[in-house]
Structures are given as structure tokens and as C-alpha cells.
Amino acid sequence: MIAMKRLFPLIASALLAVLGAGSCADRTAAEPPLLITQVPLDYFNDSTAAVYLADLQRGGVDVVLVSLEEVFQTGAAREARMQRLRDAIRYFEDAGFRTGVWTNSLGYGGLRPELEAQYPGLLHLTEFGGRTGGAVCSTDTLFLGLMRRTVQDIARAGARFILMDDDLVQSVRPGFTCVCPGHLALLKAATGKDYTREQVRDLFTGAPSAERTAFLDVMGRSMTDFCRSLREAVDEVDPGIAMGICASYTHFDAEGVDMEELSRILAGQGHQPFLRLSGATYWPAVAPRFPGQTLGDVADFVRMQAGWYRDRDIILFDENDPYPRKSDIVPAAWCELYDKVMMAEGGVHRHKYMCCYQPQQPERAYVEAHVADMEDDAVLLGLFRSTAPCGFRVWEAEHRLRDLCLPVPYAGNGRMMVEASHSAAAAFLGANGVPSCYTGAGGPGIAFGDQARLLPSEAFAGGLVLDVPAALALLSRGVDVGLAAAQPLDAPSAESFDGGEPQPVSPAGTCYGLVPREGVDVRVLGEFVAGGKRVPSCLLCRTPDGTFAIYGWDGYDQLFRQPRFWGSTDRMHQLREIYTLLSGGKELPASLRDAGGMYALAALSADGKRLSVLLCNPGKDAVSAPCLEIPGKWSVSRTLRTEAAREDGALVLSSLPAGGWCVVQLAIPASTRRRFSCP
């Protein structure tokens, strides 16, 4: 098997001895990220072990997670299952793999008849309307006792580390937050007041309040108390066993917790925390939560989280999960594209669910696609070594719910969970083939939604792209963005760009006619046609507080709903122009001339002499001759899976097949580097 790869010099930490990994924050490391995969215990036996082992060895896997679900058996049945776990751990350890155990807890929302039959009366996660499912609440002390026993049994089985799955979450299954009797009782204890479910719901409307903060604090304490108790249970068996958690998309805000704190609680004394980020390959294919979400949107969601945690000394890995692990539902090519984006981004280890299959009915596509790409993966890592992503800096606050001004009446569970987690700004850039980055400051940035009120001062240095809620939030903070009013419009029928002919549009939600403040230095970059009139749809305003490009819509109304309105060739050209206007004449290092459903990630070396660009095509059709706009002088120094030619000042690549990807690396002379503006 391929030897264990170490990313960076080991820190004195027991967890590093377990994973053989560093926090992955240093992009200059010569070694690649670790490759982690899972093997389901329920399918592991004497007749299947060799099948798994062969795939792990062929795939160059470093760390194995034996996955163990729903551990609620008792007596002989439980002991038999735990013996199988001990056998599996020993088998993979003897074969040279670092081996841990992945397990679930509160539940995925489906009914759990075996559990309910043994333990009737469990508290279930409850949404504002009173609906429940099979997921149990963290406030249930009986269930906590069951989980303490489970993690102790796993520790005794010989696991080097334990990873709790993303069902350790109090939202999603079935709603936004939890208002079960347990949480309502905790809220009363904290505030001295009785609350109904509906009254808690209404805390998430209008202006921020002490009551909203109190409820989120209660939610957070119930989760941290649950996790602290699990950590203590493992310590009673072996404090040398580290624990980590898989993030759900609501973990970073709606749960009321701080994920760094939660990760450190679970990790235990002397262990470096580890955290699997949220954002799975299957989301665009089978998850009903975000209809219209693209694979690029998912990748940007993971990249955003990585940006938050890059310098916090936490081991990060991604969620490359093609659930239900059938390639006719989630294409194997998507797993490879996701993998390429995260390797190009850097700073995140690879958690690739390519062995989660039944050997009796094997799904070979994921392993075979991975093996076929291994040599090129190594080349890709080299092309992006010592680089950092460039483009518009996406500004997103990790914690925002306590401070947001929210719609009245309540906007609904779906809108709340998305606005408290995903980035509408990143999705807008992605729909237009415009590269983005999630760390650094100084270059042009973008922020959508009311969360813009939380922007740090350094976000203003390079100018900002805003939607209407972001602009109004900054105005309420006393920032002069140059806007006098945003007037709601009947649905616009068309939009023109920089004085051009109007093009038909069909936006979602409310659009606005923008009215600049009197006397402001303003330029109209676009106009809506609504009710027979033309009104500004995009303004560039220069004020004493900065330079702002304002779009006449609510980004979260558009998110995952109207990609054709957001993404167009005209909009792409407009964004390139905005970048130059915000940066005082600097230019985007790279962008697509026509996105065509492709995803682009661009990265510059620290000295600016190398520009590497990854293109991915998750679509069902090939893209003929994709074209990159790259300003100034440059030369092609390396290509991977493509051919490149300069035509009319742009870089034209060979056709990109459906599910295909390619990389081009350019040498950038000093004269061109001076034209770039990057965080």
C-alpha cells in the first residue's frame, strides 16, 4: 500500500499520531492531503474483507473509518456486533491503515422502531409547527446515557479516534432549531418566562433581541453539554482516544454553538481538534433542501467553511459523499470534480466515500474513477502548490443569526436555514464563471444579505458588491453606500447592461429600482425594464466610505432559484467591469468568457509569477472550446487534460467533456502582475 503521507512536521498531539496529519493550513507543504474513506461494518465479514482491502490499497487510502450505525442492541446481539467491530479495526490496522470509527447519534429523521420499542417516550426534535420525526433531542437524558455507552464500547473495541456523524444536530430533521418540551423548559429556566413554539418562531423575525440570543444560547448549551458528556465517557475508558464531529450545514450558526469550541470539547485534552466540513456531492442530485443548487455551489460552501477555519489549528476534511452511493444517481465524475476543487483550494484533507458499498452488489464506479485519476491528481496538487485562490473576496459571517434583521412574518424554515449558512454571493459569482476566494483582504469583495452589517473594517478597502439587503444593512450601520432608496418593482420583464439593448429576464422574489443619494459620484451599470419604465438595476457609487456596486435584488430570493437570471454572458462582462472599477483599474486575473455551466477556480503563487486555473464541467454536455479572459501578457507553462492556444488576447482550451476537468498554468511577467488586484 502507499505509505502514510504526512503533510507537515508533527505537532506534539496524540491526534496527529492518529491521523498523521496537520491542520493543512500551510499551502506550501510538499506532501499531499490525507485520503480518508469509510468501510461499513455491516457489510464487513470474512468473505468481503479482501475486496475492501484491495480497493483501499489501490486507491492509496491513508485513514480508514469503520462506519457503525444505530448501536442500540443489547445483550448477545450487541456483543456480537462489537466483536465484529474489534475484528474490523484489527484487520485494517494490521494492513497498515490508521483506523477510527464513524458513528451516528440523534438520528437522520426516519423512524427507528427498534429504538422506540426499547425506550418509549424519548424526546424528539420538534419544529415550530409541532412536527417531529425519528431524530432524538440532545436534551433527552436517557438517550444521552445510551450514547455514552455506545462511545465507550467503541473505545474498548480499539478505535484510535471516533468521528460523530452530522446527525448530531438539532435542526434539519425536521425543522429550524428545536422547540421540544426539553428545550422550552431550558429556555424558561434561562429567562424566567414561558414560551410557546410559535413565540420562539417569532424570535426569528424583525430586529435582533435578547430573547433570540437567549434561545440560541440554550440551544448551544444543550449541544455542548451533550458532547462534553460523550467526551467524558470516552475519557473513562481511554483519554488517548480523540473525538471529532461531522458538521451539518446548520452547525455553524443555527445550532447556537461555536464549532471551534465544540470541536475542542470533543477532541479532548492534548488532542488537536478535527472537523469534517459540511457540503456533500449528493446534494445537487438527491437532497430536496436546495432545489437548483449546483455542484459548484456545494464546493463554494465547503471552501467558505475552510476559509473560516484555516488558521485555527484544526484538522479539516471534506464531505465527498455520493449518497446513496449509486453512480446512476450521483455520477462518479462529480466526486472527482469535487475532489479537484478541494485539492486546488488547499488546506483540507480528502474524505472520499468511495468504498461505502456492499461487496455482494459492488458499485465500482467511484473507486475506478478515483484510481484512474490518481496520477493526474498528483500533478494537479503540484500545479496548485504554494498558491492561494484569487478573485472576488466573498465576505460571509460565520455567526450571524443573533444579529440579523429578519423578514416579518417568519420567512420559513428553509429560508432561515439557508440564510444562516449558505452564501448567495458565492453562488452569484459561480453562476457567472467568476473565480472567488474566502481569505485575505485588500481586493474587491462581495457580500449579500443583512449579514453585511457584520462586515469587518478591512472588507471595505477594496470596494464591495452588495445586494439591496446588504446595502440597507450598511446604511443602518452608518456606512454611506451612496443609496437614497430601493423602490420595490413589479416583476421586471427585461434588463439592460451598461446602456445596451434590454434582454428578457424572469427574476425570483422582489427586485428594486435603485435611487442614488443626491450628489454622490454614481454610474449606472444596468437598468430594469418594469411597467414600461427603465430604472437602475445596478449602480456604482463612490462615497467617502468606499466604492460600492449595488444590485437591485435580494440575493437570498434568487439563491438556487433563477440561475439564468443571475448567470449570463452580459452579467459576466458586467462583473469583470465592476472588479476593475472597484479596484481602481486593476483586473480579474482570470474569468470565463462564457460560463456554460462550468466552475472555475483560479490561484496565484505568493510571488504572483504563476497563475493556475482549474475548470470543471459538471454538466451533461461537453463544452466546446472554453475560453479564459486573462489580462496582459502571459505564457502557458503547463496544461493538464487540455490543450491551450492564445486567440484575440484570450486563452482558448480544447473541448471539455461532460464530467471533465482541466488545469492550465500560466507564467505571469511583472508587467501583468501589476494589473492584478487580489486579497
What are the roles of these predicted feature ranges?
Residues 98-157, 195-216, 228:
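Active-site-adjacent "subsite" loops/lids of carbohydrate-active enzymes
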Residues 46-72, 156-161, 273-275, 338-350, ...:
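Catalytic domains of carbohydrate-active enzymes, especially glycoside hydrolases
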Residues 242-412, 504-505, 526, 549-553, ...:
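Hydrophobic targeting/anchoring helices
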Residues 420, 436-440, 448-660, 666-679:
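A conserved amphipathic helix/loop scaffold
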Residues 78-81, 108-130, 165-203, 259-263, ...:
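Aromatic- and acidic-residue-enriched segments that line the glycan-binding/catalytic groove
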Residues 34-42, 100-105, 163-167, 213-256, ...:
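Aromatic-lined carbohydrate-recognition surfaces of secreted/lumenal glycan-active proteins
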Residues 35-44, 67-80, 129-146, 207-224, ...:
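The substrate-binding groove and active-site-proximal loops of carbohydrate-active enzymes
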Residues 146, 157, 161, 178-243:
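Active-site neighborhood of glycoside hydrolase catalytic domains
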